[in-house]
Amino acid sequence: MQLFPVMLATLCIVLQLLIGSSALATTNRHVSNSHWLPAVATWYGSPNGDGSDGGACGYGTLVDVKPLHARVGAVNPILFKNGEGCGACYKVRCLDKSICSRRAVTVIITDECPGCSKTSTHFDLSGAVFGRLAIAGESGPLRNRGLIPVIYRRTACKYRGKNIAFHVNEGSTDFWLSLLVEFEDGEGDIGSMHIRQAGAREWLEMKHVWGANWCIIGGPLKGPFSIKLTTLSAGKTLSATDVVPRNWAPKATYSSRLNFSPVL
């Protein structure tokens, strides 16, 4: 199937040509309210399943294995933010004391819920995560309720033993490079992404294509590549030097040696 990489490349070309507000802008950036806020929650998939099968963020099979396994969720556009909310982490807790646990569950945003509420914050959780909102023995009855009121707040992402990694998307070439960001501690979201080629001093802005995917068109692009990330919420910056090697390959993942601090 070559349609997906072709679509990514087309989107990247269109975005390169657009002139408008840059994703670099850091004014008015702030981490989402750390206080508990009201929302609603539903669940999807099998009762004890992982939920998403990849999702609109583009994480693919990562959602099926630890550390994302059974911790993923979809959100409505309020928190999805056209894909820039991908990777953010939230604590979610339900409210009915007769059936709900006092403990909150941690949810990693990996998908968008197009059928969810457009006006109020809505989490669509995996069956496994939704069940963990209940006290012991009440997971089934809680799932039977379908839609429940919850409270949520932003929390720091923590991928123990993991550093930020960059997955080279299928179809990438020396003239079109698309990267997916994985395992970002702290805020978890990306506001802008820049790339620096071998022997260069200039950082080139990458374009946000969709989900957690970013791209650049130019050519020929020469590795190794250094990558600079700026978080969406607070504008924190991190640079991974020569993280993508000279002989990089499509569908390969390259881990850095660093990560953001696992705090907000």
Swiss-Prot record:
It is a peripheral membrane protein. The keyword Signal applies. CDD domains: DPBB_EXPB_N. It is found in: Secreted, Cell wall; Membrane. One of its GO terms (cellular component) is plasmodesma. InterPro entries: Expan_Lol_pI, Expansin/allergen_DPBB_dom, Expansin_CBD, Expansin_CBD_sf, LolPI, RlpA-like_DPBB, RlpA-like_sf. Keywords: Cell wall, Cell wall biogenesis/degradation, Disulfide bond, Membrane, Secreted, Signal. Residues 175-256 form the Expansin-like CBD domain. One of its GO terms (biological process) is sexual reproduction. Coiled coil: none annotated. Disulfide bonds join 57-86, 89-157, 94-100. Residues 54-162 form the Expansin-like EG45 domain. Residues 1-25 form the signal peptide. Belongs to the expansin family. Expansin B subfamily. May cause loosening and extension of plant cell walls by disrupting non-covalent bonding between cellulose microfibrils and matrix glucans. No enzymatic activity has been found. This is Expansin-B3. It comes from Arabidopsis thaliana.
